[in-house]
Amino acid sequence: MPVRSVLVAIPLLVAGLVGVAAPAQAAPAPLTCQGQGVDQTAVLHHEAETFIKAPLRTVWQVQTDVMGWPAWQRAVSSMRKLDPGPLRPGSRFRWTTPAPATTSTPATTLVVTSTVQNVARDRCVRWMGPAIGPGLRIDRGTHVWNFTPARGGVVVRTEESWTGQQIESDPATAIKYLAPGLDLWLADLKKAAEAR
């Protein structure tokens, strides 16, 4: 299954703009980890998923071994764990990622400080924190990952929300980076896990 992206707000926005009721169908349940999800009130959030042909323990290990991210994830320049041991509620890690110039912000490097909020081994993980760089600030990103065993591999679903005055002032530009960023992360995770 190729990487599939769903911009959650578009169907609601389109239905609201044209004044037509959306067809009756069950909306996909928001992603959660131990009952907690992204900020559903955030202007910016995006969901994506992929199928990975690898054992669940392999996919989980690749994704949750944050010190290994720079080796397989193109968008991660550096990583530092701020707490020893495996990911658990309260553990923190700091990583950097390049952010290209936009019409309203310069090219910069974001320093992301993530704090794990929820984790259930081989099932889900949720973290949140700010991403700050010269000329660009995301006050709080919230990121949820779900791992579901499937025939021949694992379905990985992820959802992320961003909040902050600067990025909310230009959501059309911000979503151009949030959406492809998640798709790239999933593609890199798929490649790394399937190669093991």
What are these regions (language model features)?
Residues 24-83:
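Hydrophobic ligand-binding cavity/cleft-lining segments
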Residues 61-74, 98, 121, 187-194:
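Sec-exported extracytoplasmic/periplasmic mature domains
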Residues 58-63, 69, 93, 116, ...:
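Hydrophobic pocket/interface hotspot
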Residues 1-26:
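Secretory targeting and sorting signals
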Residues 128-180, 184:
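Beta-strand/loop substructures that line and gate deep hydrophobic ligand-binding cavities in soluble
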Residues 43-51, 92, 111, 124, ...:
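Intrinsic-disorder/low-complexity, polar/charged segments enriched in Ser/Thr/Lys/Arg/Asp/Glu/Gln
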Residues 81-135, 191-196:
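Glycine-rich portal/gate segments that line the openings of hydrophobic small-molecule binding cavities
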Residues 51, 58-61, 71, 111, ...:
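Extracytoplasmic/secreted proteins, especially bacterial periplasmic and envelope-associated proteins
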